[in-house]
Amino acid sequence: MRSTIVATFAAGLVVASLVAAHGIVTDIEIDGEWYTSSLVFEDPYKIPIPERISWSFFGSGNSPVADFTTRDIVCNGNASAAALVAEVDAGAEITFYWDTWPESHKGPVMTYLANCGSDCRTVDPGALFYFKIDHAGLEDGEWISDQIIANNLSYTITIPEDIAPGNYLIRHELLALHLASDELGAQFYPMCANLRISGSGIINPTGVQFPGAYKMDDPGILVNIYNDIDTYTIPGPPPYNSDSEFSDDDFESVAEISAASVSVFNSSDFIASTLTKSYSALASVYTKPSTSDFKLKKSFSLSSVSVPDGSSDNFDCNVNG
């Protein structure tokens, strides 16, 4: 009887310690400016409740989202919209600081952006489309979660320089895989914050929706990390890469191009070549879907071309979608 009580007590201590060790983001540094994140164990008891840039999930505490097929996977359980918005320039760095993270909770980190339209404070986060801007997992036998612990419980990402300005929801999460060998054993720790991104970019990458982006049998979600694995597939789409405009063959335009002016030499072959190479200059919006083919979604035709005599002149053309 005594041994049963001792065993039960020990198991309770293990569970309690694991619950206490679950982490949340407590601070966010945005281009050198600090913001306190929503504090699930403090803010609900303050009068008035502090306004934050991060969405609150007071009812969930620091517990993980186990069932990623529910709306809880978007911004955590019973998430409520944040009242404030942080201003940030495209190309700036954002650092997320966690309060704690147990060494046993090995796994990847992932960060997404979603364009909210007019206002992130009134949007339904489950209706948005999220494009990944950063992720890290297992590299050279070391999990990124261990690096986060070693780096003062912090992780830094960079806002892509070429994305279009606007209101964005940033979604940041750690995924713990210590129980991921069982279905729904993977533990997600997502959070969201409101951003207003400034810049001169024109890119609107395609995205995925939550729930829906992750599947039960994804190799990065249903996985036994104790099998001495050498490689690990991070869940979700690949991160958007600003540098891959001409190196990757997977851009697809959704822009409607009405007119353009291109400087060319007096050569019909050069005109055709320049129109092809100058496609990026003509389009106002790009998206980057998960396809291996470079496609122009909007077909276009030259309605008029006038090239005066001379070695180098301008011509005007109308590009019709």
Swiss-Prot record:
Keywords, ordered alphabetically: Carbohydrate metabolism, Cellulose degradation, Copper, Disulfide bond, Glycoprotein, Metal-binding, Monooxygenase, Oxidoreductase, Polysaccharide degradation, Secreted, Signal
CC cofactor note: Binds 1 copper ion per subunit.
InterPro entries with a match to the protein in the record: AA9, AA9_LPMO
GO cellular component: extracellular region
Enzyme's top EC category: oxidoreductase
Biotechnology: Lignocellulose is the most abundant polymeric composite on Earth and is a recalcitrant but promising renewable substrate for industrial biotechnology applications. Together with cellobiose dehydrogenases (CDHs) an enzymatic system capable of oxidative cellulose cleavage is formed, which increases the efficiency of cellulases and put LPMOs at focus of biofuel research.
Signal sequence region: 1-21
Cystine pairings recorded for this chain: C75-C192, C116-C120
Cofactors demanded by this protein: Cu(2+)
Catalytic activity: [(1->4)-beta-D-glucosyl]n+m + reduced acceptor + O2 = 4-dehydro-beta-D-glucosyl-[(1->4)-beta-D-glucosyl]n-1 + [(1->4)-beta-D-glucosyl]m + acceptor + H2O
List of residues binding Cu(2+): H22, H105, Y189
Main subcellular localisation: secreted
GO molecular function, one term: monooxygenase activity
Residues bearing attached sugar chains per UniProt: N78, N152, N266
Enzyme Commission number(s) of this protein: 1.14.99.56
Subcellular location: Secreted
A single BP term in Gene Ontology: cellulose catabolic process
Family statement drawn from the similarity comment of this UniProt entry: Belongs to the polysaccharide monooxygenase AA9 family.
Function: Lytic polysaccharide monooxygenase (LPMO) that depolymerizes crystalline and amorphous polysaccharides via the oxidation of scissile alpha- or beta-(1-4)-glycosidic bonds, yielding C1 or C4 oxidation products. Catalysis by LPMOs requires the reduction of the active-site copper from Cu(II) to Cu(I) by a reducing agent and H(2)O(2) or O(2) as a cosubstrate.
Designated name of the protein: AA9 family lytic polysaccharide monooxygenase D
